[in-house]
Amino acid sequence: MIHHTINFDTLTIRDCLETFELLKKELIVVIKKAPTNPLGFHRLVSGMSQIANWAQCIWDTEGNYTGVPKEPLDPWSTDRVLVQRVTAKEKDDKPTGIFPKGKLDWHSNLNGPDRADGVGLQGYAGVEDTVTSWLDTAAAYDAMPQSLKDKIRYKYCSYTYNMARWADTPWHQDQRWKSLVNKMERKDDIYRMWIEQENIAGVKGLYFYTNNDLKIWDDDIGLYEELKEFLFQEKFIYHHEWDVGDIVLSDQLLTLHRRPLRPDAVFEKRILHRLTFPISNTSEPKFIIEKNKSCYSKKELEIFWK
């Protein structure tokens, strides 16, 4: 994790690209108390990469539902953007954000090697005295004993996307988001990835997403528990205590994040804005797909990764 300073009043593409290079190497970049006008956040992310979840930016900053955009909006050529909100706040008895309350355990946006492998969160309102935690697998890999590295080398996991294991989502929000989720999901939610990973900047770490259903192929007895016990140590975890305006950017290939359980009233006041974007997957063919192709047979590649 590294702290970074940006002047959003004079933000340039060069500032964005410098931040992007920092993110590739450090995996977690924290910008404290940035302006809460989402225009700056959107310009930063679009200047670094491209906004992947533009079709899920369906609210204005007051929580009014605006409908699903038909095309992405260039934040550099407008003075107003729509947002994706993370909040339990309701308006007219309707949800105004995703992941509203309850459990949000260790997870990543990278639910498959084709996905956007970057996430940005900004504290918009009511975030004081709340925490989000990030697990840095590169730090864990650096500290890993050679004996464990030898056990995970050439091992891959088969994953099945299972949001119910890591998030509590009320049924009414599930229904509201069903059409959007279907547009964003792959036809088949089963995917494979090597445990050892390396991002586009050459940073080595792990992809070990324990809260999706997973099977380690050719597993040695006890490897799952041994790796999980080593990985989720406090010394590899960064706890971010939110202030209004804070932006946290993170690499989703080599980190996981979670929020602790809090009373519903806390999340009914708390509003985060969320953007997803590619980091290693900015290239074509996508970098992470190419790195994990050898987990698949030729026939499977023809089906999944055309």
List where the protein language model places each region.
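Non-heme Fe(II) oxygenase catalytic core, chiefly the N-lobe of the double-stranded beta-helix
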Residues: 2-246, 253-306
